[in-house]
């Protein structure tokens, strides 16, 4: 004999809704951990972004879990979060590293920060900076002109178009910028790391 409990369509709908909510919660947790562990940075547009709220509310536990399993420190800012690793914890390709391209990008990031500080550039409410592709190209070439002696032979002699494409691709890959036709969107990660040569830099030419 089969026994059945009385159940209504409302019960089915409630059960389905609860399962959906549970699935969404699990998906959100997986998404947040995945972004922090395999992506350079995690961004959000609005303060009420569900992933961002989960991250902020659970930052203590997320930070603890990531540190125990991957090392490093969880850093959370207004519209971004990232996992920064010490040298001993690093895995895969890292930024920055001891190579000319990351070094050039650090100088470009510093130039952007300098122009922001003096009012030549402005941030939007969600921490983005919008710049024409030409303006960005001029900024890159200004960095090379200023620090030419410190750049490697390959980068000193690289034509302007290739230099721009090389730096743009690197910064896109590391989620620092996004290209939109003739406009460059600069993301908050650009302000996270930057570099300058020391004040006593004499311009020793790199091979």
Question: Where do the model's predicted regions map?
Answer:
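Long, low-complexity, charged/polar intrinsically disordered regions in eukaryotic proteins
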Residues: 47-118
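Glycine-centered, phosphate/nucleic-acid-interacting loop/turn motifs that mediate DNA/RNA or nucleotide
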Residues: 174-175
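Short amphipathic alpha-helical interaction segments
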Residues: 1, 155-170
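Short, contiguous acidic/charged loop-to-helix segments that flank catalytic cores in large enzymes
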Residues: 92-99, 120-128, 149-159, 192, ...
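Extended, charged coiled-coil "stalk/tether" helices of large eukaryotic trafficking and scaffold proteins
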Residues: 188-205
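Minor-groove-contacting beta-hairpin "wing" of winged helix-turn-helix DNA-binding domains
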Residues: 81-85, 183-191
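Short acidic, hydrophobic short linear motifs in intrinsically disordered regions
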Residues: 38-49, 122-155
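Short, small-residue-biased leader/transition segments that mark boundaries at the very start
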Residues: 3-5
């Amino acid at each position: 004999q089969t026994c059945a409990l009385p159940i209504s369509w409302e019960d089915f709908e409630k059960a389905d809704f609860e399962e959906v909510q549970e699935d969404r919660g699990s998906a959100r947790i997986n998404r947040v951990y995945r972004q922090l562990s395999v992506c350079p940075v995690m961004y959000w547009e609005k303060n009420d972004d569900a992933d961002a709220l989960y991250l902020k509310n659970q930052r203590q536990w997320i930070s603890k879990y990531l540190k125990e399993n991957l090392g490093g420190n969880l850093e959370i800012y207004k519209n971004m979060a990232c996992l920064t690793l010490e040298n001993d914890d690093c895995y895969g390709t890292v930024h920055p590293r001891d190579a000319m391209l990351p070094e050039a990008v650090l100088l470009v990031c510093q130039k952007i920060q300098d122009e922001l500080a003096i009012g030549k550039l402005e941030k939007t409410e969600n921490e983005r900076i919008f710049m024409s592709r030409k303006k960005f190209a001029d900024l890159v070439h200004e960095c090379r002109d200023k620090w030419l002696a410190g750049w490697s032979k390959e980068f000193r002699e690289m034509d302007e178009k290739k230099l721009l494409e090389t730096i743009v691709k690197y910064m896109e890959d590391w989620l620092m910028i996004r290209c939109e036709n003739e406009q460059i969107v600069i993301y908050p990660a650009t302000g996270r790391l930057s570099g300058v040569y020391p004040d006593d830099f004499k311009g020793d030419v790199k091979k």
